UniProtKB/Swiss-Prot annotation:
Source organism of the structure: Methanoculleus marisnigri (strain ATCC 35101 / DSM 1498 / JR1)
Family assignment from sequence similarity: Belongs to the UPF0173 family.
An example molecular function term from Gene Ontology annotations: hydrolase activity
Keywords assigned by UniProt, alphabetized: Hydrolase
Gene3D superfamilies for this protein: Ribonuclease Z/Hydroxyacylglutathione hydrolase-like
One Pfam family it belongs to: Lactamase_B_3
Family matches, as InterPro entries: Metallo-B-lactamas, RibonucZ/Hydroxyglut_hydro, UPF0173, UPF0173_UPF0282_UlaG_hydrolase
Protein name from the UniProt record: UPF0173 metal-dependent hydrolase Memar_1421
């Protein structure tokens, strides 16, 4: 599977299908037209261009209902649920965050914030969404054993690097890719120490990607 970080919390997963997660793209454009879109929560910096893409979109029930009013073929689900879309398995996991749809007027409640474990072509990727650290991340390790963990590290609106180090240990994925940092001044981070500390004290590898950069991931790749 080819994983591409598109900046902020947006990733493309390309294998037998092309999936885009949280299609807010601060720089550049999508590397390929997605088959499926996944949205972790309703905030504008995650919902992004989901309406414009108008592809099959996996989202929490409230966001899915909103997208359907815009003509998007959305697939609703909720925390703990698992669905399969075009051969790709999506499990919705908890996240500790808020969620608000900004439409006309003051906006409205967007359901719970969430993460996803996405399994395609035998590879499992955990996208944590926007979240604080929580101890039940250990259950994600025990239940799903992800090959890759995509973790927010920017602080302010999510956990920062110190908490993300603990999250990486809880989840136990052999490869961690940081996200949700450096997009805005409030979430500026220098992650060199984060990478050094994790790689010195665990067997986990950290990939610090630049927007638009891709890596190959899978059970045989993550631990290299």
């Amino acid at each position: 599977m080819r994983l591409t970080w598109l900046g902020h919390a947006c990733f493309s997963l390309a294998g037998s299908r092309t999936i885009v997660i949280d299609p807010f793209i601060p720089e550049g454009s999508l590397p390929a037209e997605p088959d499926i879109v996944a949205v972790t929560h309703a905030h504008a910096d995650h919902l992004g261009i989901a309406t414009e893409l108008s592809k099959k979109t996996v989202a929490v029930n409230e966001v899915a209902k909103y997208l359907k009013t815009k003509g998007v073929p959305a697939e609703p689900m909720n925390l703990g649920g698992t669905i399969t879309v075009d051969g790709v398995r999506f499990t919705m996991t908890p996240a500790l965050h808020s969620s608000w749809l900004e439409d006309e007027g003051p906006g409205f409640y967007g359901g719970v914030a969430a993460g996803f474990v996405i399994t395609m072509d035998g590879v499992s990727v955990y996208h944590a969404g926007d979240t604080a650290l929580f101890s039940d991340m250990q259950l994600i390790r025990d239940l799903y054993r992800p090959d890759v963990a995509l973790l927010p590290v920017g602080g302010c609106f999510t956990m920062g690097p110190e908490e993300a180090m603990i999250a990486a240990r809880y989840i136990g994925a052999p490869l961690v890719v940081p996200m949700h940092y450096d997009t805005f001044p409030a979430i500026r981070q220098n992650l060199e120490e984060f990478k050094r500390t994790i790689e010195r004290t665990t067997s986990i590898r950290v990939a610090l990607l630049s927007p638009g950069e891709s890596i190959e991931v899978g059970p045989e790749k993550a631990g290299e």
